[in-house]
């Protein structure tokens, strides 16, 4: 635990020193949509934690520079502890980002009377925190697998591929009326609670797989 505490302190110091611009951009985007759009509470509540979930993986790139790994592993830190700390750090930061997003969404509702942030929406936001943890886990796995500039390029490419696949599947379903009706009928037969549980389980599964994969990647790394 001593090694994890030291790594957490390092990453928090690095994040707050390098993340000032990130918070400025997040605040600007949130303010812009609050002033210009009609329905922004949900967007803000999702946008802020999603950006932070992706950004937490950037601490890995700083560890790679100037033989940082060699220095870290000369301390009471091994590869398993290093990966474990990255996931703990991403969990803390993503949870904090989620809380900030919900608070900002609540402020938006107070500022703009036409906004609605009902209990159903809050329940949905509780589910999204698991999704963001899965995103953070995937980000860490990619950054560990692809070092330096490769990691910076692979991550947006992977996101684009996922969106492209989702768009292709959505277009195919929309064009196939029979399949669309079958899917809608199946969804109508499933309650909201079952869908929520399925999303949580799927997110936790993705997070766990990314953790196991990150452990294997780190074990094979050569410095």
Task: Enumerate the predicted regions with their spans.
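Alpha-helix N-cap/helix-start motif at helix boundaries, enriched for small hydrophobics
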Residues: 81-83
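Short helix-to-coil transition segments within interhelical loops
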Residues: 74-79
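Hydrophobic alpha-helical transmembrane segments of membrane proteins
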Residues: 1-67, 85-223
